[in-house]
A protein has these predicted regions:
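Conserved catalytic cysteine-centered active-site region
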Residues: 26, 58-114, 146-147, 160-164, ...
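Conserved beta-ketoacyl condensing-enzyme motif
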Residues: 24-114, 118-137, 207-217, 289-290, ...
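Active-site-proximal alpha-helical scaffold in enzymes
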Residues: 90-120, 173-202, 258-265, 331, ...
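N-terminal extracellular/periplasmic Venus flytrap/periplasmic-binding protein-like
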Residues: 14, 24-25, 29-34, 45, ...
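Condensing-enzyme catalytic core mediating Claisen C-C bond formation in acyl metabolism
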Residues: 1-26, 148, 228-293, 297, ...
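Short, well-ordered amphipathic alpha-helical segments that serve as non-catalytic structural scaffolds
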Residues: 28-44, 69-73, 98, 165-172, ...
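Flexible glycine-/small-residue-enriched beta->alpha junction loops
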Residues: 113-171
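Active-site pocket-lining segment
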Residues: 56, 167-170, 279-349
Length: 395
């Protein structure tokens, strides 16, 4: 059996909304359906019934995104009922995992046309109450927020593994001696690059606003922020001597993204030129408390699989969960030219809707490669509980 080439024909995303912001009244299954429908509408020559499967990442899945949000999106988007859908969860890497699983299906001949993406509504993530082990327990019961982080943790897990995500970022800052000023400068650059990219219209080809919502661009970008403004923010996780703040970490967000993946036959049916080709991917594990450094080995492994090196990269979308985490990874890739990293801004400015982010990054790289005409691109994320995920694209 020969392995087929896998092409990205198109990629779309919503503007990313802030927690409690413009998209907070929109259900996650409706967000997912919106990008699926937009993707299909942008390839009118392709019969929607030809979509062999829809893969969607979703990190929480405890609320309106329960019971296979991918399948719900298919139905809500008006695709034929014959089109199936599957939801995958690799936490922050869920959207990229969906892209990788769709690519694998096409590569081995199980599919010719697939949609892959991700969704998250952190605003609408519910509170949950753990079911007691016996009826009528005495005392108070605890509600858990499903928006972010550890909950109902297994007591067998070592305490050092289950630290808060922000404390994990502080551990990376400790490991690489990253100052507050370095982290704030990285965050400022993220906002500046994102604002400039929007001003130049660089996101016009991939962002599809949600109808009826007054949101045309990413909601968390702060055009006028400064080092002075960022310096006024208090540490969020270590009151004494901490360096991680709300200003140098990604916010809580709502959004969705989707990509159209095809083989050669599917490409002919669309009648379109592909944005990029999927070349390789890799996933690795690391100590859970150092999750922020998860991309370090995943990126090296993905590049090795692709037969490429850091010098070959023309663009690199690295998810900015925290400035400390991103800077820690960059410190472990001395061969990498930092100028190719997040040229249009990153998650600190754009936002990090957990299950959608990996698909957003993959789509961003594909669009950047298409704009350049040729090159090698990379997308990577750190993942809570200690993993890293990376994807190599080429054009």
């Amino acid at each position: 059996m020969s392995i087929r080439d896998v092409y990205i024909v198109d990629a779309v995303r919503t503007p990313i909304g802030k927690f409690g912001g413009a998209l907070s009244a929109v259900r996650p299954d409706d967000l997912a359906a919106h990008v699926v429908r937009a993707l299909v509408d942008r390839s009118p020559a392709l019969d929607p019934a030809r979509v062999d499967d829809v893969f969607f990442g979703d990190a929480n899945g405890a609320g309106e995104d329960n019971r296979d949000v991918a399948r719900m999106a298919v139905l809500l988007a008006g695709l034929p009922v014959s089109v199936p859908g599957v939801t995958v969860n690799r936490l922050c890497g869920s959207g990229m995992e969906a892209v990788i699983q769709a690519a694998r299906a096409i590569a081995v001949g199980d599919a010719s046309v697939a949609i892959a993406g991700g969704v998250e509504s952190m605003s609408r993530a519910p509170w949950v109450l753990q079911k007691p082990e016996r009826a009528f327990p005495a005392g108070h019961q605890q509600l858990h927020s499903t928006t972010l982080g550890w909950r109902m943790t297994n007591p067998r897990m070592p305490a050092e593994w289950t630290v808060a995500l922000g404390e994990g970022a502080e551990l990376v800052a400790d490991k690489h001696a990253l100052s507050r000023e370095q982290q704030d400068a990285f965050a400022l650059a993220s906002h500046q690059k994102a604002a400039e990219a929007w001003a130049k219209g660089l996101y016009d080809g991939e962002v599809v606003p949600y109808g009826g919502v007054d949101l045309a661009r990413d909601e968390c970008i702060r055009d006028s922020t400064s080092m002075e403004a960022l310096a006024k923010l208090k540490p969020s996780f270590r009151p004494d001597g901490g360096t991680v703040t709300a200003g140098n970490a990604s916010p809580l967000n709502d959004g969705a993204a989707a990509l159209l993946l095809v083989d050669e036959a599917g490409l002919r049916e669309t009648g379109r030129e592909p944005l990029a080709r999927i070349r390789a991917s890799a996933v690795t594990g690391i100590e859970p408390q150092l999750f922020g450094l998860g991309p370090v080995q995943a990126v090296r492994r993905a590049l090795d699989k692709a037969g490429r090196g850091f010098a070959d990269l023309t663009t690199f979308e690295l998810n900015e969960a925290f400035a400390a985490q991103s800077l820690g990874c960059l410190a472990e890739w001395p061969e990498l030219d930092p100028a190719v990293v997040n040229p249009r801004g990153g998650a600190i400015a754009i936002g990090h809707p957990l299950g959608a982010s990996g698909a957003r990054l993959a789509g961003a790289v594909a669009h950047q490669l298409a704009a350049a005409g040729s090159g090698t691109g990379l997308a990577a994320l750190c993942i809570g509980v200690g993993q890293g995920l990376a994807l190599v694209l080429e054009r």
